[in-house]
Amino acid sequence: EIPELTRYDYDVLNIPASTLNEEGLHTWQYKVEDINKLRDTKYKALFIVNPSNPPSYQLNKECVDALKDVVTRWNPNLMIITDDVYGTFVPGFRSLMADLPQNTICVYSFSKYFGATGWRLAVIALHEKNVFDRMIANLPRKRKSELAKRYGSLSMQVENIKFIDRMVADSRQVALNH
């Protein structure tokens, strides 16, 4: 669930995990036709909790294959942010990061695993070669100049600052990053 913040004027496409099995029981999976909406390059990011919260169902092969097709054939710059916090509760869990590593940021919180509800301690993982760095490198000159001002206190070669390092700097309000 993504909060709707008026500060950010995003168009949000909600894709419900609404499939049912033959007995009419909820499977917590997405319809392939809904995943296929992400083929449209107007969609820039996919935020997903996998396994789902609260039932801890991981994406099935059909959903993963549909996402792989979307990224491979239609929307190669789709940014995927996956919250894998419930992965330890699913035997044989496989993250989207394993299937779409260059497009995926994996978020993992320690609070669920250690039963420390309320803690705000987490890690992120990002492939060394990723769409985020590639998209920054391909920004127009004007936007790169804006970013150079923002991150200029970090490096003489601002253009070489990786996305993950920018995230760390932003989490510390850039100037306090040390």
Predicted stretch roles:
Residues E1, I35, Y108-S111:
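Catalytic micro-motifs at enzyme active sites that drive phosphoryl/nucleotidyl and oxygen chemistry
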Residues L5-Y8, I35-R39, L78, L96-L100:
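Alpha-helix C-terminal capping segments
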Residues N103-H178:
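Conserved core segment of the aminotransferase class I/II
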